[in-house]
């Protein structure tokens, strides 16, 4: 929204009276099982600003959890959606198909890693994409088992909860979960380095550790797929050691195991590449299947599985689909989103944001030992907070910092298995001045805590 002034403004306490009134209505109408990070109700948003119903303007360093990468209500998306809504809103691609779905599949086949023939299928959410990727892998290999990793998050359906590592709030009380799911150790350089310096820097060694666990737990002969986030999202923006992912991919290829890259949070320029797999090795990583969602359509519900044609074509006709998957309005938004990323130089913009944010945070880390680690890529940067003089996770400090930042008009998110990580996911359209102001506020609050 170009007309929305790009400056922070607080005219009430956070949350203000109008948001508080809506919070009471929410409590009477919405299941209490739905959590809320910051109880301000949004009136409009654009660029790097979210304006609430009280007229407060908050600096957005969350992008709706990495969704509005190109900014809320991006002009090309608004125009494309308006045009599509006026033409038709739904027919179901499985009943009477339409060009938009095909065009999105063509674009995904073009921009995802890998030069060979590819195919795509569209769904609504990241969890649907991951679940269907597992279906496709099982169909292709004829094998049942799936391996996920420590700290992983893959969704809230039954199967993707089984793949997810963290119990609260995602899994507790919702079992039993899908069988034939196994877990392997991730390369986590900061935490690995506390035990073994070699593990922190040698990705091949960390991969050998994981493969050893996989061989003992399940064995390649029973394994359909390995599912991994190239940079973990909810787990804490963990960037594995160099060589870890290529070694796993090589093992998968040698053992007829499908390598599934969950790029739901990392995809579409977020990490300073169109996809995070591109950062791995001299030529990038070419997964067998790649799952995308979040940033794909600037906030409209859309997800996809894209991959090698021979794998994607393995399921029988009618085995994949869904009533709303690849909705025409969401497809129009996705095409406009991809065009915006490519034409507006947003991949380079993510790299600029990385330099600005990491420079600021590492400078603070040098004088504050409660910052255990600063990590991430592009506009996907995390701060791991620990108790002073130790490496013990400090979830309490993290919560206090987030709460105080919200009260000061800055939207930040927390994550991690131990709840001790601040994650920064600004829209790529945020200006340097606004981004710097948000960082100033967060850093000043941390210094005072």
Curated annotation (Swiss-Prot):
Belongs to the class-III pyridoxal-phosphate-dependent aminotransferase family. CDD domains: OAT_like. The gene is gabT. GO terms for molecular function: (S)-3-amino-2-methylpropionate transaminase activity; 4-aminobutyrate:2-oxoglutarate transaminase activity; pyridoxal phosphate binding. This is 4-aminobutyrate aminotransferase. Pfam families: Aminotran_3 (PF00202). Pathway: Amino-acid degradation; 4-aminobutanoate degradation. Its EC number is 2.6.1.19, 2.6.1.22. Disulfide bonds: none annotated. The keyword Cytoplasm does not apply. Keywords: Aminotransferase, Pyridoxal phosphate, Transferase. It catalyses: 4-aminobutanoate + 2-oxoglutarate = succinate semialdehyde + L-glutamate; (S)-3-amino-2-methylpropanoate + 2-oxoglutarate = 2-methyl-3-oxopropanoate + L-glutamate. The modification N6-(pyridoxal phosphate)lysine is found at residue 294. It comes from the Bacteria. PROSITE patterns: AA_TRANSFER_CLASS_3 (PS00600). GO terms for biological process: gamma-aminobutyric acid catabolic process.
């Amino acid at each position: 929204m170009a007309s929305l002034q790009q400056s922070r403004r607080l005219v009430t306490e956070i949350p203000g009276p109008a948001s508080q009134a809506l919070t009471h209505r929410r409590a009477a109408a919405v299941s209490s099982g739905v959590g809320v990070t910051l109880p301000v109700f949004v009136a409009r948003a654009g660029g790097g600003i979210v304006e609430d119903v009280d007229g407060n303007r908050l600096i957005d360093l969350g992008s709706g959890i990495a969704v509005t990468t190109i900014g809320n209500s991006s002009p090309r998306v608004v125009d494309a959606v308006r045009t599509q809504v006026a033409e038709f809103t739904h027919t179901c691609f499985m009943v009477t198909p339409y060009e938009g779905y095909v065009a999105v599949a063509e674009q995904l086949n073009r921009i995802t890693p890998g030069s060979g023939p590819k195919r795509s299928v569209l769904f609504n959410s990241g969890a649907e994409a991951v679940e269907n990727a597992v279906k496709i892998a099982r169909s292709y290999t004829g094998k049942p088992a799936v391996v996920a990793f420590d700290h992983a998050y893959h969704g809230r359906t039954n199967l993707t909860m089984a793949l997810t590592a963290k119990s609260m709030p995602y899994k507790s009380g919702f079992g039993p979960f899908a069988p034939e799911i196994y877990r392997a150790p991730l390369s986590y350089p900061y935490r690995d380095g506390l035990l073994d310096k070699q593990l922190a820097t040698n990705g091949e060694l960390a991969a050998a550790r994981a493969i050893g666990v996989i061989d003992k737990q399940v064995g390649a002969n029973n394994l359909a797929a390995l599912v991994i986030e190239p940079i973990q999202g909810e787990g804490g923006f963990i960037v594995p050691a160099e060589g870890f992912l290529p070694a796993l991919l090589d093992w998968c290829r040698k053992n007829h195991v499908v390598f599934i890259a969950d790029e739901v949070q990392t995809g579409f320029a977020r990490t300073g590449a169109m996809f995070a797999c591109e950062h791995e090795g001299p030529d990038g990583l070419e997964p067998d299947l790649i799952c995308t969602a979040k940033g794909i359509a600037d906030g409209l519900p859309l997800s996809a599985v894209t991959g090698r044609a021979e794998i994607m074509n393995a399921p029988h006709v009618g085995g994949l689909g869904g009533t709303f998957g690849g909705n025409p309005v969401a497809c129009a938004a996705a095409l406009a989103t991809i065009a915006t990323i490519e034409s507006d130089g947003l991949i380079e913009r993510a790299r600029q944001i990385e330099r600005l944010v990491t420079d600021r945070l590492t400078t603070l880390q040098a004088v504050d030992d409660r910052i255990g680690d600063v990590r991430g890529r592009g506009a996907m940067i995390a701060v791991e907070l620990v108790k002073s003089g130790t490496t013990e996770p400090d979830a309490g400090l993290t919560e206090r910092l987030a709460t105080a930042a919200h009260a000061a008009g800055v939207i930040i998110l927390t994550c991690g298995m131990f709840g001790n990580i601040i994650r920064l996911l600004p829209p790529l359209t945020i200006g340097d001045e606004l981004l710097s102001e948000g960082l100033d506020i967060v850093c000043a609050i941390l210094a005072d805590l």
